[in-house]
């Protein structure tokens, strides 16, 4: 705020000084004024788009924390959650219970707890009668997520399936049928999950890992799997972060 006040210059004066500066300081202030205005309107348009999108897309309401989440928390949780993980989970619960479609970014280093937070978010969907899907950019990463989540859910009666391009024939048909009937509760896969033949009974939450490796159209196709778009949780790994939520 202090920078804005100190370097504030009327638009007409800024336009004049950008072409005919009276001194180096006037040129700097004019450049700052014009750059600030450009960035301000970019941010304003982003905010306007976000508000408009919230009005147009209502989200499913996850009203309850039920037996699935509580059983996992009390019996299967491999370690105590960190303060950051608890805070992020609370924010996610607020989002999915607000009536607006969640579109949240979850960032953290490798091993910081992102996958565990994503799984517990998916369990919230299951508790409220919905399915969940996780999409990863490669078969190797999808397999890693599948094995990790299967291990974390060991002993719980939750059908988790893996769908990649290499899964074909009867096994693939069984997975697709299970998605339609609702027997498959959690689907983990690659780009294969956005194919036209993949349809859900009630998809409530989509988790996307490393979203920068998917195109906008590819990510958006998951939203069309329901009449009403599901909640979206995007996981990304940054080199430096203080906001952590386990790969």
Where are each of the predicted segments found?
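Conserved motor-coupling elements within RecA-like helicase/translocase cores
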Residues: 169-186
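Conserved helicase motor
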Residues: 162-172, 190-195
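Conserved SF1/SF2 helicase motif Ia
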Residues: 124-145
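Post-DEXD/H (motif II) to motif III coupling segment of the RecA-like Helicase ATP-binding lobe
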Residues: 205, 213-242
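Upstream accessory/linker segments immediately N-terminal to the RecA-like ATPase cores of bacterial MutS
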Residues: 2-76
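Conserved pre-motif I regulatory segment
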Residues: 64-104
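Conserved helix-turn-beta segment of the N-terminal RecA-like "Helicase ATP-binding" lobe
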Residues: 143-167
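Conserved small/polar residues in nucleotide/adenosyl-binding loops
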Residues: 1-7, 240-247
